[in-house]
From Swiss-Prot:
One of its GO terms (biological process) is positive regulation of apoptotic signaling pathway. It comes from Dictyostelium discoideum (Social amoeba). Belongs to the peptidase C1 family. This is Cysteine proteinase 6. Residues 348-358 have a biased composition (Gly residues). SUPFAM superfamilies: Cysteine proteinases (SSF54001). Disulfide bonds join C133-C178, C169-C211, C269-C416. One of its GO terms (cellular component) is extracellular space. It is an enzyme of class 3 (hydrolase). Residues 20-113 form a propeptide. It is found in: Lysosome. It holds the Pfam family Inhibitor_I29.
Length: 434
């Protein structure tokens, strides 16, 4: 399983856009990908998914030969179209062009740093996974709340708080549970509610349920939040210097769908049509960005296992979903593998995955690929970068992007709208709780 996972990424790294792959090469790559992701198809569905996989593989190969700082790979989304990806994993784009981001009364002080990484400071909890619930907004809000509480406590006592409480209990503020919501509305709920429970006491279920808030299990209390000046990356940097900050982005492009490593640079992104809530935990610049997982974040020895499947239908802003199974892997770029089966189509392997393209059957085929990668997927998490970047925490599990993170372009005209609708909360020190 580990070999097969690295294999798929290797193949797209060594192929060139001008190389015409044979049908057998496509088929072998697809077979290996199916095994790595435990994909199962009916015989009727196989050909359709195979053709989509080939088109996506061609897109990835062509992109990776352009010399972009963004590296793409055959991840969990390799057998679905971009239309399916957007309909299933992202919400209806929220038009933020006329949105009035009114700051709350509290204003933070401080000076903007040249670079910051709140993971290294211990203010970021491990990567989480929203599963089949369109609750990215709640994960973004809890991430910012967790960081704010840690900082308010004097850089101590990092506590994971409950996304499920926000999903179940903040409906009266305008949020729609697993159907979507806004981070600012989540902050308002936490402030007025007098706190939010710990994740351990109110665990995530990936469904909208009856509110079960218990004030005896509070893990964080907020006093206020501040909105970033819409569109201002310099103001966003000033806020991120103060702590992890909730941001909304356009994640609809195929390049985001297949993101693997490097700085994400996509001029086609919209700065106003936003469909995904994430967390900015830092920023940096230079020719070599070291993004190793340090204290406050969950480490993993591989960035490209991509063992993940999901299914959801969301229709509101900031809603999208996915489900992943995290695993540890080794990044060897010279691997070979063989898969065997008979009569029908499957990716045989341990465990199981259910999703929008699941079915049944088995597959046969064998392949052996070897080569070297210059895409920058090293075990230490060091990725070639060229320019300024935001360090962004996603909620699609460890098997997406760089151990669950993405480096997004910074100071490129608010690319993907990262500064259009951003906000940061301020917490009450635990010593001052009632």
């Amino acid at each position: 399983m580990k070999v097969l996972s690295a294999l798929c990424v290797l193949l797209v790294s060594v192929a060139t856009a001008k190389q015409q792959l044979s049908e057998l090469q496509y088929r072998n790559a697809f077979t290996n990908w199916m095994i790595a992701h435990q994909r199962h198809y009916s015989s009727e569905e196989f050909n359709g998914r195979f053709n989509i996989f080939k088109a996506n593989m061609d897109y990835i190969n062509e992109w990776n030969t352009k010399g972009s700082e963004t590296v793409l790979g055959l991840n969990v989304f390799a057998d679905i179209t971009n239309e399916e990806y957007r309909a299933t994993y992202l919400g209806t784009p929220f038009d933020a062009s006329s949105l009035e981001m009114t700051p709350s009364e509290k204003v933070f002080g401080g000076v903007q740093a040249n670079s910051v990484d709140w993971r290294a400071k211990g203010a970021v909890t491990p990567i989480k996974n929203q599963g089949e619930c369109g609750g990215c907004w709640s994960f973004s809000a809890t991430g910012a709340t967790e960081g704010a509480q840690y900082i308010a406590n004097g850089d101590s006592d990092l506590t994971s708080v409950s996304e499920q409480q926000l999903i179940d209990c903040s409906g009266s503020y305008g949020n729609n549970g697993c159907e979507g919501g806004l981070m600012t509305l989540a902050f308002e709920y936490i402030i007025n509610n007098g706190g939010i429970d710990t994740e351990s006491s109110y665990p995530f279920t990936a469904n909208t349920e009856k509110c079960k808030y218990n004030p005896s299990n509070i893990g964080a209390e907020l006093s206020s939040y501040v909105n970033v000046t819409s569109g201002s990356e310099s103001d966003l940097a000033a806020k991120v210097t103060q702590g992890p900050t909730s941001v909304a982005i356009d994640a609809s492009q195929p390049s985001f769908q297949f993101y693997s490593s490097g700085i994400y640079n996509e001029p086609a992104c919209s700065s106003t049509q936003l469909d995904h809530g994430v967390l900015a935990v830092g920023f940096g610049s230079g020719s070599s960005g070291s993004q190793s997982q340090s204290a406050g974040s969950q480490s993993q020895s591989s960035n490209n296992n991509w063992s993940e499947s999901s299914q959801s239908q969301d229709s509101n802003s900031w809603s999208q979903s996915s489900q992943s199974q995290s695993s540890q892997d080794s990044n060897s770029w010279s691997q070979s593998s063989q898969s065997q089966g008979s009569n029908s189509f499957t990716g045989a392997g341990t465990g199981s995955g259910s999703g929008s393209v699941s079915g049944s059957g088995s597959a046969s085929g064998s392949s052996s690929f070897s080569g070297s990668s210059n895409g920058g997927n090293s075990n230490s998490g060091d990725y070639p970068t060229d320019g300024n970047y935001w360090i962004v925490k996603n909620s699609w599990g460890l098997d997406w992007g760089i151990n669950g993170y993405i480096l997004m372009s910074k100071d490129k005209d608010n690319q993907c709208g990262i500064a259009t609708m951003a906000s940061i909360p301020q917490a009450i020190p635990k010593s001052k709780w009632n």
